[in-house]
Amino acid sequence: MPWPAHCRHVTGEVGIYQTLKHKPLAEVRAAIRAGQYCSHTAGLGKGFLQANLAIMPEAYALDFMRYCQRNPKPCPLSGVSDTGNPMMTTMGGQIDIRTDVPAYNIYRDGRLAGSVTDIRDLWQDDFVAFALGCSFTFEHALQQAGIALWHIDNDKTVPMYRSGIDTVPAGPFRGKMVVSMRAIPEDRVAEAVEISRRFPLAHGAPVHWGDPAGLGITDLARPDWGDPVPVPEGHVPVFWACGVTPQVALEAASMPICITHKPGHMLISDIPEDAEIPILRPQDQHTSQTQQGETHDTHA
């Protein structure tokens, strides 16, 4: 599917984004599925686990699962699809991972080949999809505590940086940890640490705060992904492990094809943000669908 014209030149459609911030998850997902919204998901689907996405041929899946197990901080595994099945049933009975992410990155032989908003035409019978929890999940809790987040207030994508921290390799997967940054008032850093610690499926507590040089980051104004954000006087840069880390590992693996979310453009699941176990049983899926009043077509 070609990149929609209304998504080509802007970070986000401000009017649509501001509207969706106050809509229930069912309406947010419907807008994404219809191609009406193709920007970042920070601040959307409040109360539900957001997830990074990695899709690859089954031949690589076991090594990738090992990579996630060995690196739980940047790669908190929250869902794995059945081979060839695009319905991520344990994360929501109505989730179709081919259409329910605002934007996808396509990698061929380890190189970014382009971005699309729909991967139905690229889907393969041997694909396995992995969902990895995202720090967008705990942002709702930070906001509820009165901690403002500049990127959400200004419709920007959170900045992400390649750190100098090595991950533990598994098979062909290896690389540096990616971190996301949020500027937090100095007198509230300890509170932000404790709040985010309650969300282990969304990277949990930060890995570092203060001088970015401690992570090998030389210039906060030049993130590797996302948008630069200011660090006002009296604020401290706080860094969390980030689910873009697997994209670095996927580049190193040089698979013939793999697909990820575009950084900042997440899969929003039906799993409550504070769930201890990221699995929806069949009866839970029915309850979730009823509560959301959601309808779905199978894209046949």
From Swiss-Prot:
Identification of the protein by name: Putative hydro-lyase Dshi_3152
Matches recorded under InterPro entries: D-Glu_cyclase, Putative_hydro-lyase, UPF0317
PANTHER family given in the database record: D-GLUTAMATE CYCLASE, MITOCHONDRIAL (PTHR32022:SF10)
HAMAP family the record matches: Hydro_lyase
Alphabetized Pfam families for the sequence: D-Glu_cyclase
Gene3D superfamilies: PSTPO5379-like (3.40.1640.10), PSTPO5379-like domain (3.30.2040.10)
Keywords: Lyase
Family listed: Belongs to the D-glutamate cyclase family.
The keyword Hydrolase belongs to this UniProt entry's keyword annotation: no
Gene Ontology MF terms: lyase activity
Signal peptide: none
Lineage, opening ranks: Bacteria, Pseudomonadati, Pseudomonadota, Alphaproteobacteria, Rhodobacterales
